[in-house]
Amino acid sequence: MRAIDTNVLVRLITRDSPNQAASAEAFIEKGAWVPVLALTEAMWVLAAVYERSDADLAVAIEMLLNHKDLILQDSEAVAAALDLFRSRPSVGFSDCLILQMARKAGHLPLGTFDRGLAKIEGTQTV
């Protein structure tokens, strides 16, 4: 199976370049794997460059999770992180994903200096 990077994800979500969006769709047509690093990078690009809201990011993540041609790395952790992200708007998606991946791997508590993240079960202020 093929894999895709951050730029392909951004084109699939924003469709700001019709030619690149079409190329991205054609590339993933037979299935593509999405690394969590590409997913978190894409969410950063959408927030920082495209100024998308947290609600927009949540919709984009859900779309990717449900996309018929995409397989997200550790999709269970991504889905759990999405739920947490939606319920804790002060905590970024990347932090939610880090916590859920640590939880799944059995490596808790997650040490953090982030005050918002530290309020969530499974974390510990360092």
Language model segments and positions:
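Acidic, PIN/NYN-like endoribonuclease modules and their adjacent C-terminal/linker elements
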Residues: 1, 99-126
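Histidine- and aromatic-rich ligand-binding microenvironments
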Residues: 4-5, 34, 91-92, 114-115, ...
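Amphipathic alpha-helical segments within well-ordered protein domains
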Residues: 43-47, 62-65, 82, 99
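Short, well-structured N-terminal submotif of metal-dependent ribonuclease cores
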Residues: 1-34, 49-62
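Hydrophobic side chains within alpha-helical segments
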Residues: 8-10, 14, 44, 98, ...
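Active-site neighborhoods of divalent-metal-dependent phosphate/nucleic-acid chemistry enzymes
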Residues: 69-111
